[in-house]
């Protein structure tokens, strides 16, 4: 959400953006142009010139010197143009407007980015860079996009002092590619770097401001694409300022279940909030569980043996196969057979209820499994909404869970719920806490896991009277596809039981999905509300789109000919993904059609593509939906799980969505009826292009970036598929090692493989899993995205945190890692000189430097 780019030296380099009389904002189009063409230094020069024109008393220094021209805009907008002499083209133009003239200025919190005491700064929005001869058309496009409408029958005038002429309207050839949503980045700079920060909407800004001001538990619910992660990351400077003002040495914990999301947040903090980095720990839930066990119990849990909601499919299938082979209990075998095609229902009950729930009053004391009498009998200790099985089935499930616990011990596996439950006592006994705890994608967590994180937030008095914990939990109940049984109401109950005041806010603005997909989202939500009336009010939602793209929603007839065209030709595209219901369907398509671009819903959660094809997500569970439509009254139970799977699938699409369903289910009929003309039906296609999805191929860098996302989430087969089609540096090397990485464990070896091919950030994540913190620290010295000063600072901080002696480190790794030699040989003086700047917290820094000198002399 904030990015930093170094730029070359140029005139007026001593000026800081905070000293200027203007605030600059970049719309996403020009941001991409500047970034792709390395135009940071040219842009800064223009900004300084604009500032001088606005603030100078010199009559010769005015906007005319910048080729300033005014266009007659649309509605309340006034559109301007500036000359933009740059290294790519010295006759380009920038299309812009003043914030005060921007028709939708009240929708964005532009004021938040005024980093000066001068609150009267003018704000300027830069929209795009265009060729001189195309400026009128580009200004017209910008005006249309600002007003979110099309003007085929109007005329657009270009005006300056010398001439006035009418420009014929350019018809919109393809609305799907011409329309675009608008998001903005503020621009700040000093003499070393440029920082881009995403501008929050007023809605997002108001919600996070509430959390900072009230310092109370905060529930931030938000629909898919509403900017929940953006909002939580933006809190970091405010939280750090609060900690500093208190004179506290406490820290912030930012936790998620996704490795990919963890890496995204971590990079943003290092790049944009580096000065706050020492105040925040960014972890996956698995990270924090293993770290606490290692630090306080001196226990290294093999992370390849931990079963989580992200990894349960493979390991739980092993258990069910074992049970099928060894059990002589006919009731158990019959029950397993009954749910053979829906193993997730069995696992959900075990993981989310029998092992993952905390009872109605959040007071569970039994480890490994809830009390049998509470679960089997009709006890009020279990949340009513969680009771979806009959009593005889609950007896069988309880017995299966007991056998599962035994299987875990015998095979040296760990259930993440069991680890979290045991850590609750450790956290209380050792008084382990953070000043702030931020939980992203909270719907992915069970109650046991949430309660552990709740305990990590320090309980404290606020305003000298009420006790509280500063914990923010952000998520979306409609995206529960992991077996957690998450309910927002359960969080409210937790806070109520502790006597805490709390805030509960919601984000309903959708920035991801195009207009027609958003319409479909609302139709699906309305159907869920109608069919599951017991659904809690917090799960009911109506989405408001902030994406101006119309997009398309299509249904393609599921004929053999159409399926063959789609599944054999989809591999060539980096901009289209196919989502299927489970691994069996994915393997079937791969075997029959050679289809490599198919993903399960779980694999694709947290990711997005411009174009999504959804195949048989409704048809594969037709019997479930038929049951929903036949019954008059239903508990939400596991039914919401199937609706959520469909909702998550369709919301992965940024612009265009294609439905392929072999069965005409009642829910599909209702969706089609309510979409009406917004759904296009395609009877036959001859080529993949007949889907009319626009640009399909993408480029090599897109393929590589998608591959990296899957690699971070340890989806190696999917990562390999994209690496093999990319020609970016290291694509081939990464593709080669994907097969090796499918093996369990061996994290240290995997880290070495990644180090060998120069993937240092990736290598660091595997060294962390291997508990090899020496190599973990060394990786900082290889990260080119960090300045040398920052490399040293992170390196030494890690040594200090882990109690690693530099002398021992050099003896063990000096000959292998050349960067250690650099410290000793070439950079010892600079290290000494920078020691105060990098804020070394190592005891006896002078002794450390003395040891380095001795070793250098000895070499």
Which residues does each PLM region occupy?
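Residue-level signature for tetratricopeptide repeat
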Residues: 709, 738-740, 753, 765-766, ...
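Conserved helicase motor core of SF1/SF2 NTP-dependent helicases
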Residues: 198-201, 221-238, 246-250, 257-263, ...
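N-terminal pre-P-loop "Q-motif" helix
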Residues: 196-216, 419
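Basic, Lys/Arg-enriched alpha-helical interface segments
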Residues: 1-93, 99-177, 520
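Coupling/switch/interface segments within P-loop NTPase motor domains and analogous charged loops
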Residues: 105-107, 278, 301-414
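Non-Sec secretion/translocation targeting segments of pathogen effectors
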Residues: 854-859
